[in-house]
Regions:
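Catalytic domains of carbohydrate-active enzymes, especially glycoside hydrolases
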Residues: 26-50, 286-287
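N-terminal regions that are enriched for targeting/export leaders
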Residues: 1-12, 28
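Short alpha-helical segments and helix-capping/turn motifs at coil-helix boundaries
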Residues: 25-32, 194-202, 276-278, 424-428, ...
Length: 527
């Protein structure tokens, strides 16, 4: 049975001189790091546009890309900018945290200049093909963003009522008035696409696959909610009638109120789940594997009345279940999906996951609270993906230092037989590497032995999330050696790396044999 591993690091966390990670040289360097350490996967968070709060799970579109990730140096190479266009610009000077306000403010005029140069100089054949191939999602998105900017970035439900309800004459007038802004959004999506596809092509050539991430829900402030309200449970004015969240539990007395609109599954089923099939089809153009967030919501979901301030008054409502995934498989074949099956689990959710055949997830840091937890590695199953933690959790060291009580720490040390010289992070990484799961994914923070100062997200909080960045000197030879040793010891080497290593050994053995034979021949000649 094949065993593999990879690393979770979002694009925003790559080192960069532009205040936030990008599709530039650091991304290519990271692919090289993965390749030389025998990894098979690079897992990232959603690539979608981010809104207030900067969460990649709350996007203006289920399809459009985050233009923060467009690398400006690559635009120079393409001829659409010069380095002077951004020399001296302050994108945020902290090497370990993103300043989203500065990134948003400073990048826009630079990208506008690149767009103008592109439109003036470029051979637009590839661009026109991009527009044609992506028209179904691209044109509505560009229209939405242009009108949104016209109304000072307010969400669609705070626009003029005629624009909110898509009065035809109003929309035609706005499109004419905002033609240049629509064009800007088309072109920057093209820039995003060509840079990402080039990076993905490079990764795939190195036998590295990309694991992408798909939020189950769209944001209320999204083009989908504005353009296709019939796909959601709404009132007559197209506002959500119910919203998503999680019920109260031992950790949150009020539950979690996410506020996302909830799908009208009857309407989606009526057209054969066409929207979901299109969404996944487009996702597999971006990624090799897709992790679907909140997978249990397809079996049943927590539905909360719109306007409530907590999740207490919600109720469980049945979702489409396996019927959706049968329709997807019929159209797209055996797609590679990871089911994020964490949280409140029932036998019905487990049965749905098992029927699809998708691997679920295991989080090792959850396993040390006492008893024979399902999150302890000896209880994992092969068809699973194991983590120390994800973007929503503490780092391994952070968990040990800040959350684990003394009993949990003692249990962890005994369970992992951790010696005094082994770091907490390495012991946890060793735990998932040794597990039976077919895939182990390490977070970059855990590989670097970082604490909660490097945590990516604290759910249900705002203001200090999604900011962590890796230092430019983090990918050391020592780190590469440690990860390669871990990967080799627990038989998780990328098959391509293993084959290349074996081929190199054969070459070296052949060279050695030839050298020996030559030396023997020389000795025989001199006798």
């Amino acid at each position: 049975m094949q065993r593999t591993s990879g690393v979770l690091l979002h694009i925003s966390s790559l080192p960069s001189k532009f205040g936030i990670g990008s599709f530039g040289q650091s991304a290519y360097d990271f692919v090289d790091f993965l390749a030389k350490t025998g990894q098979q996967y690079w897992q990232i968070l959603p690539l979608g546009t981010t809104s207030y709060g900067d969460s990649p799970y709350q996007s203006f579109s289920a399809f459009a890309g985050n233009t923060h990730f467009i690398d400006l140096d690559l635009l120079v190479e393409a001829g659409w900018l010069t380095e002077a266009d951004y020399a001296g610009v302050d994108f945020g000077d902290h090497p370990e945290y993103v300043d989203y306000a500065k990134v948003y403010t400073e990048r826009r005029p630079i990208l506008e200049k690149a767009v103008a140069n592109f439109l003036a100089k470029a051979d637009k054949k590839d661009y026109q093909q991009f527009l044609a191939d992506n028209y179904e999602w691209l044109e509505p998105y560009c229209e939405y963003m242009a009108i949104k900017e016209h109304y000072d970035l307010k969400p669609w439900f705070q626009w003029d009522p005629k624009a909110t309800l898509r009065d035809e004459a109003t929309i035609v007038h706005l499109r004419q008035q905002l033609a240049d802004v629509l064009t800007y959004h088309r072109v920057v999506q093209y820039f995003f696409s060509i840079q990402w596809q080039a990076l993905k092509k490079y990764a795939n050539a190195q036998h590295i696959e990309i694991i992408g991430d798909m939020p189950i829900y769209v944001a209320a402030d999204s083009v989908e909610m504005w353009m296709t309200p019939h796909y959601f449970k709404t009132s007559e004015d197209h506002q959500p009638s119910v919203v998503a969240g999680c019920p109260p539990d031992a950790f949150t007395a009020d539950g979690q109120l996410w506020g996302n609109p909830i799908y009208n599954w009857d309407a989606m089923k009526a057209d054969g789940y066409a929207w979901w099939i299109t969404r996944l089809k487009e996702s597999f153009k971006l990624y090799d594997v897709v992790r679907i967030d909140h997978f249990r919501g397809f079996e049943s979901y927590w539905e909360i009345p719109f306007g409530d301030t907590t999740a207490i008054n919600g109720e469980w409502v049945k979702g489409p279940g396996s019927d959706l995934f049968r329709a997807i498989r019929k159209e797209l074949g055996d797609v590679k999906i990871i089911a994020e099956d964490l949280g409140f689990m029932t036998q019905e959710v487990i049965d749905m996951r098992d029927e699809t055949g998708f691997p679920g997830m295991k989080i090792m840091q959850f396993g040390f609270g006492g008893g024979d937890s399902v999150d302890l590695p000896h209880n994992y199953v092969y068809n699973s993906v194991c983590y120390v933690g994800t973007h929503d959790n503490e780092t391994g060291l952070g968990w040990f230092q800040d959350s684990a009580d003394e009993a949990s720490r003692e249990f962890f040390n005994a369970y992992m037989r951790r010696g005094e010289d082994e770091t907490v992070s390495h012991a946890l990484n060793r735990g998932i590497a040794a597990a039976v799961s077919k895939m182990a994914i390490y977070t970059m923070q855990d590989l670097l032995n970082l604490g909660n100062e490097a945590r990516m997200n604290v759910p249900s909080t705002l203001g200090n999330n999604w900011k962590w960045r890796m230092k430019s000197d983090a990918l050391t030879d020592q780190l590469a050696e440690e990860l390669l040793e871990l990967t080799t010891t627990y038989c998780r080497l990328n098959p391509a790396f293993k084959a290349a290593s074996e081929a190199a050994e054969v070459v070296e053995e052949t060279k050695s044999t030839k050298t020996t034979e030559v030396q023997k021949a020389k000795k025989a000649t001199t006798k």
